[in-house]
Amino acid sequence: FQTNRGVSLVQRLALQDERNRRNKLSCIWLLRYGIHRGKALFKNVARDIVYLPVYYTSDGLKPLASPFLLDTDGKVIVLKGDTLNRQQLKLYRKYPPSDNAYAMGRRIVGGKIQAANRADFSDSVTIYRVPEWKSAYSLKVTTDTAWRYWRYLSAENGLCNIAELVFYQRDSMRPIVGEIIGTEGSCFNDPNHVKEKVFDGDPLTFFDAPTGSGAWVGMDFGKEVNIGKLIFIPRTDGNMIQLGDTYELYWWGPEGWQLIGGPRIARDVVLEYLAPSNALYWLRDVSRGREERIFTYSDGKQIFW
């Protein structure tokens, strides 16, 4: 609660009855509130935060007005979802990464996806070089050339920190598997961080190689295969979109949280929705986890609050 940057906020809200007047508050649980001349008065309100005006009833919390952002300049920006003008959302996370998760995940930047027909990768070609950090990567392979060996080659000083690597043959939605190959061992000889963890289906486990640079992990498919798509995940906190999990996306409307569409099973590491614009959103992972956070969407990116 940032009282050092606080401002006084008078929010003009329609008061439905005397009972509601006594029960008004603005979520994130403001410490001080009250009614003054028909207006809700909140003092020492922190900036750069989204607020949800609600009131209590016997049935729980009810929306009183649209959410709003109090920006760094003290300006109120109302987040009233527009159902007539919808926007396309591409969602990669349900919760923002911590500084540590971001720092560990960035070790993938500069890493390479390579393919070869020789076991020593002396004839390898680089299919993709990771230019920037993302929560997860969904890569369409444009070359039609078939290769037997595929791998992820660590970035410089990256310790080959990769959590998951999934291959799909062209025009197939089912992963293809082969023999796991790559650098043997792990940092400090930890059996929980060996190369096999990259293919265990658990994004919270990862390969931590015994050497900072030059380590790699991949698969020998036993024959040349035409890979059309790869999904790979850097070292992560588990709050990205997880394959096979069921998700629900909500937006804050006149009746509170409203489900967009219905539950959706993640077939990729990005979820796409057509949603009301200028709204406040909430993405739930129904399958697991507890960390979730509201967000807005601007310039093609999620902005968590």
Language model: regions and residue ranges:
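Long, low-hydrophobicity ectodomains and other hydrophilic envelope-associated domains
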Residues: 8-18, 22-27, 48-67, 88
